[in-house]
Regions:
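Acidic, PIN/NYN-like endoribonuclease modules and their adjacent C-terminal/linker elements
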Residues: 1, 16, 94, 98-128
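Short, well-structured N-terminal submotif of metal-dependent ribonuclease cores
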Residues: 1-35, 40-54
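Histidine- and aromatic-rich ligand-binding microenvironments
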Residues: 4-7, 32, 85-87, 108, ...
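Active-site neighborhoods of divalent-metal-dependent phosphate/nucleic-acid chemistry enzymes
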Residues: 12, 60-107
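Phosphate- and divalent-cation-binding pockets in alpha/beta enzyme and binding domains
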Residues: 38-39, 71, 113-114
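Short, hinge-like loop/turn segments at secondary-structure boundaries
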Residues: 46-50, 79-80, 121-125
Length: 128
């Protein structure tokens, strides 16, 4: 399974990248609660919200164990010690991926920067 960041889900919902449609239909993909929350901030109409919920419900739902939250804080502190400040949701997604030993798929450059400091973070390499 690959854990998705909201950047990928949002790009998929916009429907402008045919490659994403193919990848979403062929890969086992999951989202965690924080990604659901981020994605659901973007709806404008009830129909938009229903479409987003349907897309999110079609993905594997990955829960965040209580034990991960302390590690999120530790990882944020480690990143800051190296001069990198990232949004808390990105640190949650990265830490959850590391905890589950699965790849994270993001289009946000924060993740590559985090990986240089947190080498156990595995990032999905999007095909060209």
């Amino acid at each position: 399974m690959i854990l998705l960041d909201s950047t990928v889900v949002i790009d998929y919902t916009r429907g402008k990248d045919p490659k994403l449609h193919l990848l979403f239909s062929s890969l086992k993909l999951g989202v965690c609660g924080i990604v659901r929350s981020e994605v659901l901030t973007g709806w404008r109409t009830a129909a938009d919200r229903a479409k987003l919920i349907a897309i999110l419900n079609g993905l594997t739902q990955v829960s965040t164990p209580d034990s991960v939250w302390d590690t999120v804080g530790d990882n944020l502190a480690e990143l800051r010690r190296h001069g990198l400040t990232v949004p808390v949701p990105d640190a949650v997604i990265a830490t959850l991926g590391m905890n589950l030993n699965i790849e994270v798929w993001s289009r946000d450059p924060h993740f590559a920067a985090m990986q240089r400091i947190l080498p156990t973070l595995k990032l999905f390499q999007e095909p060209p």
